[in-house]
């Protein structure tokens, strides 16, 4: 065998040009692959999942000539992005959330507690819009929480009607401006809240019917602001301080529909405060608590109370040491009196309490500290019709009774709460 010598490749700089033509006999493909120990791949069917509909139609008609790809002139405008077709909803059984009407979604959202409602509000824009619907925010319970005043304002702006927030902490300054609230029932008892913040919040409340500010530091502007709530029915200012007798007079003169009033134990009340209060009591009051004023409440004040509030059903004058048994005839003028509290009125002689048993409408009598334990049973036997010393605390104008587990506010159960067990 004679080998042919390789020809010298000419220099590129020369004028000689060389062209190579590659060819392959397709019949030898299987022989070559067999020698390599592999086999040829079978021709797969065309995967139409990622191919646009236009190309699919061309694949169905092989006789049609293929489209020539036009080479662009360097411009990006010649490129076209073809989107993958959406999957048919028929592949997914059930009803889509997007097809549910707003009313049905609101009904579902109404079964959620506050943490879950806040969570679903972040799903999409539609759910966020629905989560702000006023029907979901009728009642709110944030008792015992550390709240920023701005957060409280935003929540009230969502249309809250009943707001239960006792023993909470809102000491930070209130910054943003806000509009009027729809709240009608509010409990801020024993909270730590800045006087300025409290004034700003209450100044936007003009529809209050029930309000409890027990134990809070107030001011004359705050008390006068409350006077704009002409529909106020229950007011609890027990243990409050920081306002003058003129503010008390303005408040009671404006709230002409009051039914329950608790002005007990306002520790900076003077004799003038008590006189201003009793002189402006509306005649609609049926439950009144003016206990805790020791020497500042006189018999003359009791006479004024009886005259201005003839429809009293429940009266608490405990810890008024200036009251004696000579004031008993005044109680007989109250034709509807059922519950009377005279605890720790030490100048009342225990034996004279038998006279109160002659009040035909009277049902309960609280005389803690007056009757010794040894003679209490004798008094109960002498007055079998009355329940004596059956309640340690007053319920007048107070929003929540029984225990801290009670989430009601004047009989209204708050639906939105941070407690998980209320969720479905």
Curated annotation (Swiss-Prot):
One of its GO terms (molecular function) is ubiquitin-like ligase-substrate adaptor activity. It comes from the Eukaryota. It is found in: Cytoplasm; Nucleus. The keyword Glycoprotein does not apply. Gene3D superfamilies: Ribonuclease Inhibitor (3.80.10.10). The keyword Cell division does not apply. The modification Phosphoserine is found at residues 64, 75, 179. Keywords: Acetylation, Cytoplasm, Leucine-rich repeat, Nucleus, Phosphoprotein, Repeat, Ubl conjugation, Ubl conjugation pathway. GO terms for biological process: cellular response to cell-matrix adhesion; defense response to virus; G1/S transition of mitotic cell cycle; G2/M transition of mitotic cell cycle; innate immune response; positive regulation of double-strand break repair via homologous recombination; positive regulation of intracellular estrogen receptor signaling pathway; positive regulation of protein polyubiquitination. Phosphorylated on serine and threonine resudues in response to DNA damage, promoting 'Lys-63'-linked ubiquitination of NBN. PROSITE patterns: FBOX. GO terms for cellular component: cytosol; nucleolus; nucleoplasm; SCF ubiquitin ligase complex. This is S-phase kinase-associated protein 2. It comes from Mus musculus (Mouse).
